Every structure is written in structure tokens, then in C-alpha cells.
């Protein structure tokens, strides 16, 4: 009886060990678990890519959306080694990783745009970048009273601070929240303010954003090269006639063949580029199209 009991105990131990090993999936290019840091202005397109990636492979990617500055800080602090940004790493940031014998790989996968929105009751739907920099510097505008950003450390805030020659957002005439959705809601409820968001929030709106879309206008921006105004449509972003177009990148600093490499390959693949195109953004390579050529021509007219 004792012999059978020992056999049963050993069998149970083996079962537990095997089960535990199976539950701990080792991360590889197309399987395992990882965390992906995302610039909050780019969250919708990344969510769309991750959803399909997880459905195709035995992988789980936890998305953490933060401001651009917070994403970079988390990347440096090793909170995660994979990020989606609207810029490449600076020389200083690259040197930090290279000193640790890690050589980040940057993969471009889409072209996005910064969108400027205003309340539907605002009659003026045209704006120039000079007007934006004037508002950043506290100067008055005939129609708009100020700017609203998602975060003082966001990529959009950083872009306009550099454009205006400022080190940080001014204390007067400029407001900030935590998310793009909050910016859209605020502009929908307040006249005379310009909201600064990622265009993908308009192309791929959540339920809360959809409820406010009929209360806002997306402004057309002057292109100084041809002196014409352009809306942030997919075609205008592709041709860069819309002056606030920008490139998107996957930054992989894992240093090994993990999900960072797999996800970067996926978003730049045929499937990933189709997802980008369908989302309203511009892929770096347009997906191929199959053309069916008929061997005979028939006349359908009677």
C-alpha cells in the first residue's frame, strides 16, 4: 500500500512541475509576455496592431501609455525595453544603451499627424503655425484664447515648445490634462480653445471620443511652402502637404530575439501595414493589391 502511495506522490509532483513549466512560457519573437511602452498620442494604432498580433501568435503584450518623456524615462530605467514613439532616440539616449552593450533597433512603420481641433461653434477652421507659436508666447488671437495639450511632457507639447523656442509650456493661455480623450472632451464643451491631439484618435475613436466628434472641428493648417491650407487627411499626410505630419517608430532595446523584434517585424509586415492603412494613417510601404486579369472581354450591355 505504501509503495502505491509513493508512486502516486511522485506522479503528482511530476504533474505539478510540468504544469508550472508550461505556464511559464519563455519569451521568444512570437511567444511569451512583455510590456510595450507607448506615447499616449499613438495609443489607438498600437492597440489595433497588438490586438491582431495577439490573435495570430501565442503572445501577450501589456500596453502602458505615457507621455513621451515618461516613455523615454521608463525605457532608460529598464521598466520595459520596447516602445512606440514619434521620434528616434537622441544621440545621448543611444549612448546610454551602447555603454550597457545594448544597441537599440528602430523600425519605422507609419506616418501620423498632430491634429488641431476646435469647438464646433468656432467659425474659424483655418490656423497657421505662427498663430500657434504666438499663443504659446502669450500673444492674443482674434478667435482662439489658448491651447489644450494632453500632457505637459507629451510629444505634441514638446513639438510646439521647440517650434516656439520654449523649454516648457507657459503658465498662461496653455492648459494640459492627462489623455487625448480628455482634451477632446474639454474642447467639445468649451469654445475658443485649440486642442492638440494625435489624429488617430479621430480616425479610430473610442466610445467617449465618438460621442464628442459632432461637437468639434478639425482645423486645416497653412503649409508655408505653397501658402495653402490642408486638413490632416490620409492623402495629405502621405504627401506631407499637411505640415504636422510625423513618422512613427518601434524602438526595440531588448538586446535579444524577443517580442520586441517580433512585434517590430509584424507592424512593418504586409499585415501590419494593412492595419496601419485601415486605421487612417499612412504605412511606410503600401500593401500589395492583387489584380485579376480576365482572358476574355464580354459586353454586358444589351
Regions found by a protein language model. Name each.
Residues 1-18:
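Sec-dependent bacterial lipoprotein signal peptides
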Residues 69-100, 206:
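Pocket-flanking alpha-helical
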Residues 4, 20-58, 68-69, 73-76, ...:
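Exported/periplasmic ABC-transporter solute-binding proteins
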Amino acid at each position: 500500500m505504501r509503495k502505491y502511495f509513493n508512486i502516486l506522490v511522485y506522479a503528482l509532483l511530476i504533474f505539478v512541475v510540468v504544469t508550472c513549466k508550461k505556464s511559464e512560457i519563455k519569451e521568444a519573437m512570437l511567444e511569451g509576455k512583455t510590456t510595450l511602452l507607448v506615447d499616449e498620442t499613438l495609443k489607438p494604432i498600437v492597440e489595433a496592431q497588438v490586438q491582431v498580433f495577439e490573435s495570430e501568435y501565442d503572445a501577450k503584450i501589456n500596453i502602458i501609455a505615457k507621455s513621451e518623456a515618461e516613455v523615454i524615462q521608463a525605457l532608460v530605467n529598464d521598466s520595459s525595453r520596447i516602445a512606440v514613439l514619434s521620434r528616434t532616440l537622441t544621440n545621448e539616449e543611444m549612448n546610454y544603451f551602447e555603454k550597457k552593450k545594448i544597441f537599440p533597433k528602430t523600425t519605422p512603420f507609419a506616418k501620423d499627424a498632430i491634429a488641431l481641433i476646435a469647438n464646433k461653434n468656432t467659425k474659424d477652421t483655418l490656423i497657421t503655425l505662427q498663430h500657434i507659436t504666438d499663443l504659446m508666447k502669450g500673444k492674443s488671437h482674434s478667435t482662439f484664447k489658448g491651447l489644450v495639450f494632453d500632457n505637459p511632457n507629451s510629444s505634441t507639447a514638446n513639438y510646439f515648445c521647440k517650434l516656439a523656442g520654449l523649454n516648457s509650456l507657459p503658465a498662461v493661455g496653455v492648459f494640459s490634462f492627462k489623455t487625448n480623450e480628455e482634451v477632446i472632451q474639454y474642447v467639445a464643451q468649451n469654445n475658443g480653445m485649440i486642442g492638440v491631439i494625435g489624429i488617430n484618435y479621430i480616425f479610430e475613436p473610442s466610445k467617449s471620443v465618438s460621442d464628442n466628434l459632432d461637437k468639434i472641428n478639425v482645423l486645416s493648417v497653412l503649409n508655408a511652402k505653397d501658402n495653402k491650407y490642408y486638413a490632416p487627411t490620409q492623402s495629405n499626410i502621405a504627401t506631407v502637404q499637411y505640415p504636422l505630419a510625423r513618422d512613427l517608430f518601434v524602438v526595440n532595446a531588448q538586446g535579444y530575439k524577443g517580442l520586441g523584434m517580433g512585434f517590430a517585424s509584424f507592424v512593418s509586415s504586409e499585415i501590419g501595414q494593412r492595419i496601419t492603412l485601415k486605421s487612417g494613417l499612412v504605412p511606410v510601404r503600401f500593401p500589395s493589391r492583387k489584380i485579376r486579369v480576365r482572358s476574355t472581354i464580354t459586353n454586358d450591355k444589351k
